[in-house]
Amino acid sequence: MFNKSKLVNILGINFLSITNKQFVDQLKTDSNLHLNRFVVTANPEIVLAARKDKEYANIINSADYVVADGIGIIKGAKILKKPLPERVTGYDTMLSLLSWANQEHKKIYFLGAKPEVAQTLSSKIKETYPRIHIAGINDGYFKDDSYIVETIKNSNPDIIFVALGFPKQEFFINEHRHISDSIWMGVGGSFDVLAGYSKRAPIFWQKHHLEWFYRLLQEPQRIIRMMALPKYMLLIYRKKFLKK
């Protein structure tokens, strides 16, 4: 665990000031020690959702690690003169952990996405990471989570990736993390990308901080969700000038 001096508060959410490598190394250490960890990779949408819902905000801030997944968080931190080292995306962190889990023969449970995505994901994991022990794969379209809870409890995975989208995935983890001393991590739409149902922005777009625009071009229906960014930036500047 990191001390509080490593935390940077952005609009009420405490972000860990850390690099990608440092974070992945910490998660590996935690996993090897069988520590129970709740990971949130937060973007501006999550920050805004937390401002509207006190219970959700409390859940986010009760997580062991909240990292900056989203260039808006990095820019906001810089504007507030509380710079964070770099983005720590859920997708990249998941890939790093999958590679490590494959080397170390770790057990992983996958929860979330549509049924067809979950099915394709199972084949993809077996093909790309053959030494990973799949503790279970379940899509996110369930009415009763008792079967999922029992499966996790009985298999005791090293890592549990939850792709239910926010805020559902954070509520799920918060409610059930006590059943297994694992790394519990919300990963949003990462299963869709890993299974090949969605495309991630090419490196050029990522390096120029335009991943959000690429996703908008791929999925125009995201325009309503994208409106969160200007609202978020308005709050950032408001906080900056009120401090003066």
Where are these regions (language model features)?
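Conserved beta-alpha
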Residues: 74-151, 155
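Short glycine-rich anion-binding loops that position phosphate/pyrophosphate groups of nucleotides
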Residues: 43-47, 164-169, 190
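Short, flexible loop segments at boundaries between secondary-structure elements
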Residues: 140-143, 182-218
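N-terminal nucleotide/polyanion-binding subdomain common to many enzyme families
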Residues: 1-86
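Proline-aspartate-enriched helix->loop->beta-strand connector
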Residues: 152, 156-161, 165-166
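A short helix->loop->beta-strand "cap" motif at the edges of active sites that frequently abuts
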Residues: 36, 106, 180-182
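A transmembrane-helix-recognition feature enriched in membrane-embedded lipid enzymes
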Residues: 72-77, 200, 205-244
